[in-house]
Amino acid sequence: MMSVLKKICGSKNSLKSFDNEVYQSIEKELQRQKSQLQLIASENFASKAVMEAQGSFLTNKYAEGYPGKRYYCGCEHVDKIESLAIERLCKLFGVKFANVQPHSGSQANQAVFASLLTPGDTILGLSLSCGGHLTHGAAPSLSGKWFKSIQYTVNKDTYLLDMDEIEKLALEHKPKLIIAGASAYPRKMDFKRFREIADKVGAYLLADIAHYAGLIAAGEYPSPAEYAHVMTSTTHKTLRGPRGGIVMTNDEILHKKIQSAVFPGLQGGPLMHVIAAKAVAFKEALAPEFKTYSKKVVENAKVLAQELQKHGLDIITGGTDSHIVLVDLRSQKLTGKDVVDSLERAGITCNKNSVPFDTAKPTITSGLRFGTAAETTRGLEAENFKEIADLINEVIQGLISGNSSSVEKAVKAKVERICSNFPIY
């Protein structure tokens, strides 16, 4: 007998034949990724192996619970996969316990909040306008609504974290949780000092390493594993895996609380196809080649920052220790929105970003955020990023001179040439 799926979708059961509208949109997105330079700091290109795992039959399997303790039968194979993911993740970051089920980095953070806090408790996190993340206590986020959120900033002259000021705020407000992490901070963080401050006020320390995780795993960025009570991260960005979240700790008691917070506290059935893709990505990150890749990510970011500086652009903190490069456009009297729109028309995608103490609206901003992880995956080297800096400058100068249309067209042709020399897949 013919299956219901075959009756609905046809005997070939292909996306193209059944839903050409979705198929064409996917194909167009693939062509966009192939023909544009992806400089969004939170993006990367997952491997075919990762995507094969995520697109597997595991999407059919429900598996509430944890390996060996499921609420459904037929979980012996997904138990093996999740156990592999946990084992590899613990090895990758040198931790004892890990949860690989969170659907996102935000949900990973929520699980930590649910484990360690009660509504009304005080938390201390980096201000969104100074490079923090929504989940670090920003007013629009649940973290800013459920808890008393105190926000630390950066030094007004150097734009670096002011650890003495953070300690002063901690001593004054006695937070129950201190968050060390960022979405737009290019420099190294002093996790040891963060832990010392946390210990002085009896606070937990959460290290949100979503942006830096791959660099940490490769030894290119300081690891908080020795200092943080809990670490959270996404699995894409510099880890180059599928979109998802993880939670790690060396404390067994906290681990048990986190397990309960993820399931049944926040989520029901885990996405086993995504967990399989995470397991594959962790294996990739354990390979020697990943260390070489991560080293190049940072080197390329440094080159990009240096070359943009040569063109007269202001680089926040004067450079970078990571994959992130932040540009302050205030001296050019341009907005982030105007520049990113022009760059996109020229085939370069990045994102507008607030700079420290920005007075522009978040939908406008006075800055740009670039990242080098995706294009380094593609194979671009330092010399290529020098050219990219030149192209970015050409677009900016085109806006300043009022000649943006012709400049965008010329730059787009150069971008397409670069992309054709470095195919993604």
Curated annotation (Swiss-Prot):
Major localization listed first in the record, in broad terms: cytoplasm
Reactions the enzyme catalyzes: (6R)-5,10-methylene-5,6,7,8-tetrahydrofolate + glycine + H2O = (6S)-5,6,7,8-tetrahydrofolate + L-serine
Known cofactor(s): pyridoxal 5'-phosphate
GO MF term list: glycine hydroxymethyltransferase activity; pyridoxal phosphate binding
Keywords: Amino-acid biosynthesis, Cytoplasm, One-carbon metabolism, Pyridoxal phosphate, Transferase
InterPro entries attached to this UniProt entry: PyrdxlP-dep_Trfase, PyrdxlP-dep_Trfase_major, PyrdxlP-dep_Trfase_small, Ser_HO-MeTrfase, Ser_HO-MeTrfase-like, Ser_HO-MeTrfase_PLP_BS, SHMT-like_dom
Similarity annotation: Belongs to the SHMT family.
Gene name in the database record: glyA
Oligomeric and partner information: Homodimer.
Location(s) in or outside the cell: Cytoplasm
Annotated pathway: One-carbon metabolism; tetrahydrofolate interconversion; Amino-acid biosynthesis; glycine biosynthesis; glycine from L-serine: step 1/1
Protein's organism: Wolbachia sp. subsp. Drosophila simulans (strain wRi)
EC number of the protein: 2.1.2.1
GO terms of biological process kind: glycine biosynthetic process from serine; tetrahydrofolate interconversion
Pfam family, one: SHMT
Function: Catalyzes the reversible interconversion of serine and glycine with tetrahydrofolate (THF) serving as the one-carbon carrier. This reaction serves as the major source of one-carbon groups required for the biosynthesis of purines, thymidylate, methionine, and other important biomolecules. Also exhibits THF-independent aldolase activity toward beta-hydroxyamino acids, producing glycine and aldehydes, via a retro-aldol mechanism.
First-level EC class: transferase
Name of the protein in question: Serine hydroxymethyltransferase
